[in-house]
């Protein structure tokens, strides 16, 4: 999994981890901040929140166009500094008046613009690391590792936001409203770490930027290693656009984690947990489980006795920690609806080595699915996740009929959502990192930035469509109908991918 990866991958992945940690720390409390600080009603706060998300995923298109003209490295650096200014403005406690609202709006625009310049272009740089022949066969596994790094940042972000806010309230005696700004300040600090890593280890990926630097300095066009004809370029762009169309519906379904799945957690899922199940709601226990997984892989792959010994020590220590936590459980723990969102990034981090190892083994025996086939399989698995939700929702009352008055005895087990997030994570691992890898591999070199930007543009459209199941929820649709629509969309998308699989495989 970790072998034969370019050194530049680790530098770019860690830089991205720092940026994503800051982004998700801000995002974890932003909606609550809008209501607590400005008193916005839920509809207005949600509109601001969703519009911001859409901007975050649409602006990489502009970032890609700019990078194709000015260079990826320059745009990544510019993006980090613009984001920093945005988070800095957001971290200032300016009050609740019109000036504060205007400042918040400006900060959101800066954060979205900076993300647009940074996010997609950094991934293009990762893709170019694998243009070298000795690394080409590890492109998919490399993007899986890069994607895992994103989720490491996301995994700890909500806890960081909550902890820093509580510390500010208890130690500094600041108000709840002002404590949100401390969470935004964490995002500023994370960007400082991110830019430090990006520059300190630039020697590991400087060859990726060498060609574009030469082109700018010498004022001579850089000849592409494999020039494409107009027909080949057109075919590749068409294939990518077909994949982008499918990606829209994946993110529409997947990002229900912050919409209908969270509503289901609030209205239909048990609010307390005890015994072994309750351990899943402590992120430190999930991290220990991740160490067990990685320790097992280290034990299997280490070629020296020292390496195997270290791996075994990690496994024993993690299991001992889990046993200690289990033996000291005291009664039931409260389960809040947002806590379920910690499972997805934890699953991604834990399952990435499993995914990489599985496909590496399939590659060795000549049975590995192609990138387009993996995308199609991802849509099928996503459909299965919502079929599972439909099965678990049988017999439950309609959303508006039940609302929030359900008693603990009539609520379903938390295991339904925990298992659903697991299924959706399998789908995500098949589609998201593989899809990004596919774009970096297939995109015509002179349109690489634009194509990566369009990937994020498709994600943005999917984010906007997330509201449709929410509208169905509010219109008193049956739960099975809501999950059925999502399952059906994923299934149709999968069938579409497999219907054009030969065309997609030809360009990949």
Q: How does the language model describe each region?
A:
Residues 79-99, 319-327, 377-406:
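C-terminal ends and interior cores of transmembrane alpha-helices
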Residues 50-68, 155, 342-359:
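Central cavity-lining transmembrane alpha-helices of secondary-active solute carriers
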Residues 66, 126, 164, 358, ...:
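Hydrophobic alpha-helical transmembrane and interfacial-helix anchor sites in secondary transporters
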Residues 17, 86, 99-121, 398-430:
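Hydrophobic core of transmembrane alpha-helices in multi-pass small-molecule transporters
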Residues 3-53, 251-264, 322-333:
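Helix-loop boundary and gating motifs at the non-cytosolic
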Residues 1-7, 132-140, 162-333, 355, ...:
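Intracellular loop-helix junctions on the cytosolic face of multi-pass helical membrane proteins
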Residues 56, 138-169, 186-194, 282-284, ...:
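Glycine-rich segments within core transmembrane alpha-helices of 12-TM secondary carriers
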Residues 69-80, 137, 301-311, 361-380:
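Cytoplasmic membrane-interface "Motif A"-like loop-to-helix N-cap segments
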């Amino acid at each position: 999994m970790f072998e034969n990866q370019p050194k530049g991958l680790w530098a770019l992945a860690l830089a991205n981890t720092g940026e994503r940690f800051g982004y998700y720390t801000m995002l974890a409390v932003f909606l609550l901040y809008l209501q607590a600080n400005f008193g916005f009603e839920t509809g207005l706060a949600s509109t601001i929140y969703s519009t911001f998300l859409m901007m975050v995923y649409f602006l990489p298109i502009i970032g890609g166009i700019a990078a194709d003209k000015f260079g990826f490295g320059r745009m990544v650096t510019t993006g980090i500094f613009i984001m920093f200014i945005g988070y800095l403005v957001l971290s200032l406690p300016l009050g609740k008046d019109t000036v504060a609202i205007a400042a918040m709006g400006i900060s959101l625009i800066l954060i979205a613009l900076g993300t647009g310049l940074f996010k997609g272009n950094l991934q293009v740089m990762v893709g170019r690391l694998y243009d070298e022949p000795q690394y080409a066969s590890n492109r998919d596994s490399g993007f899986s590792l890069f994607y895992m790094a994103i989720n490491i940042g996301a995994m700890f972000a909500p806890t960081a936001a909550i902890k820093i806010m509580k510390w500010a309230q208890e130690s500094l005696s600041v108000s709840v409203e002002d404590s949100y700004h401390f969470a935004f300040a964490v995002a500023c600090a994370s960007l400082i770490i991110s830019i430090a890593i990006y520059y300190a280890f630039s020697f590991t990926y400087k060859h990726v930027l060498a060609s574009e630097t030469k082109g700018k300095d010498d004022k001579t066009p850089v000849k592409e290693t494999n020039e494409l004809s107009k027909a080949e370029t057109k075919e590749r762009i068409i294939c990518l656009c077909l994949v982008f169309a499918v990606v829209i519906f994946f993110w529409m379904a997947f990002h229900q984690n912050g919409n209908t799945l969270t509503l289901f957690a609030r209205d239909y899922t048990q609010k307390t947990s005890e015994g072994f199940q309750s351990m899943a709601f402590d992120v430190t226990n999930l991290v220990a489980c991740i160490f067990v997984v990685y320790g097992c892989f280290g034990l299997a792959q280490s070629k020296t006795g020292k390496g195997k010994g270290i791996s075994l020590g990690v496994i024993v220590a993690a299991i001992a920690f889990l046993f200690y936590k289990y033996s000291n459980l005291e009664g039931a723990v409260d389960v809040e609806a947002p806590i379920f969102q910690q499972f997805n990034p934890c699953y991604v981090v834990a399952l990435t080595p499993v995914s990489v190892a599985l496909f590496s083994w399939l590659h060795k025996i000549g049975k590995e699915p192609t990138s387009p086939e993996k995308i199609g399989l991802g849509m099928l698995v996503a459909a299965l996740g919502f079929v599972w939700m439909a099965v678990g929702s049988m017999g439950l009352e309609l959303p508006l009929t039940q609302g929030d008055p359900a008693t603990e005895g009539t609520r379903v087990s938390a295991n339904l959502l925990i298992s659903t997030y697991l299924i959706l994570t399998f789908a995500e691992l098949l589609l998201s990192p593989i899809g990004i890898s596919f774009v970096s591999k297939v995109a015509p070199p002179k349109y690489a930035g634009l194509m990566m930007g369009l990937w994020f543009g498709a994600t943005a459209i999917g984010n906007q469509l997330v509201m449709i199941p929410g509208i169905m929820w509010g219109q008193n649709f049956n739960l099975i109908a809501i999950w059925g629509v999502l399952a059906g969309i994923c299934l149709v998308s999968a069938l579409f991918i497999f219907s054009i699989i030969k065309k997609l495989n030809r360009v990949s």
